[in-house]
Design a protein with these regions (language model features):
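Active-site and donor-binding regions of nucleotide-sugar-utilizing enzymes
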Residues: 1-101
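Donor-nucleotide binding loops and adjacent catalytic segments primarily
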Residues: 124-213, 310
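A nucleotide-sugar donor-handling region in carbohydrate enzymes
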Residues: 4, 77-155, 255
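C-terminal amphipathic helix plus adjacent low-complexity
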Residues: 271-312
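A donor-sugar binding/catalytic signature common to diverse glycosyltransferases
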Residues: 33-35, 41-44, 56-57, 84, ...
Length: 312
């Protein structure tokens, strides 16, 4: 699907729909399972036109700010899907409030705990700290990629200034896992330092870096789940947030991309004990993959029968 990426978001979405439709025509799947809220999730439109049952993981997340492109995607995907799997009870409540029938929404919980447990040996074996000459609790890991943070020149300059400010204030090394989108914006501003702005890390290395960092600064959605499950201090750099349950648990601090606010947040989260953070119960419990698998297998026939009037 990388070939679908274009210079303009609408062109990318058009390419996704065209290419997905060709794949669906070729393989004729019994169902399609969509995860998340990225542009690729809009392939639900192609699947719907072909009368293919659609299941959506991570449904019902809402930040209630339609300036965020992912918020628009979430609503389109949720309302197009036949069955929605919500991470939390609150996410289900949002969907029901929007008019989606409660019997088409299931609370699956987060798959992240299961993923982290399954890959724990590989994460433990990561030698990324040695390769980067890092000492545990003596560095920051930073990753920003969202439109609100990197698509305006002044925000990119703020990001570059933030890296220098963190290094000077805390006397720690700053490692930036640089999303391709962010790198393009940095290069356009003439801001390049390959010792700081590194290519994206693989999953095992990145989790190992997060677990051992003094603090993680990120605009990723999954930082909420990872910080709560693994117990590391984190600051999320966002103007709006779609996972309020982590805020309820006191699991992280949300601030905009302003250097002084981020530094203040880091000072707070690194001083308070992270061992006493309330667990988000919906993030825990495991066996999410089994729940999803069993539900998909169980509901394909129902969707075909009730939505598309197909008879076996």
């Amino acid at each position: 699907m990388d070939a679908a990426v274009a210079s303009a978001p609408i062109e990318t979405i058009g390419n996704i729909l065209t290419q997905t439709d060709k794949i669906l025509e070729e393989i004729k799947p019994d169902a399609i399972l969509i995860y998340g809220d990225t542009n690729s999730g809009l392939s639900v439109i192609a699947a719907k036109r072909r009368k293919i049952p659609i299941f959506h993981m991570e449904a019902g997340n809402r930040c209630f700010d339609e300036r965020v492109p992912e918020e628009i995607n979430r609503k389109i995907i949720d309302h197009t899907a036949d069955i929605n799997f919500a991470l939390t009870e609150r996410a289900k409540e949002y969907l029901v409030a929007e008019g989606i029938s409660g019997d088409r929404v299931m609370v699956s919980g987060s798959h992240m705990e299961e993923v982290l447990e399954f890959y724990a040996p590989q994460i433990a074996e990561s030698d990324i700290l040695n390769r980067l000459s890092l000492t545990a609790n003596k560095y920051f890991i930073l990753s920003l990629h969202r439109e609100e943070n990197v698509d305006r020149p002044e925000r990119i300059r703020e990001l570059a200034g933030l890296v220098n400010a963190l290094s000077e204030k805390f006397k720690c090394k700053v490692i930036v896992s640089t999303h391709p989108r962010t790198r393009v914006r940095l290069e356009a501003q003439g801001l390049q330092d390959n010792d700081v702005f590194m290519p994206p890390f693989g999953f095992f290395d990145y989790i190992a870096l997060q677990k051992n960092a003094k603090c993680v600064i990120s605009d990723s959605g999954t930082i909420s789940e990872e910080s709560n499950l693994l117990g590391f201090p984190a600051v999320t750099v966002r103007d709006a947030h779609e996972r309020p349950e982590i805020m309820d648990a006191g699991g992280l601090v949300m601030v905009p991309l302003k250097t002084d606010k981020i530094i203040n947040a880091i000072e707070v989260v690194t001083k308070l004990s992270i061992k006493n953070i309330d667990p988000v119960l919906d993030y825990r419990g495991g066996q999410v993959s089994r729940k999803i698998l069993y539900s998909v297998m169980s509901y394909i026939d129902l969707v075909n029968r009730e939505t598309w009037r197909k008879r076996q």
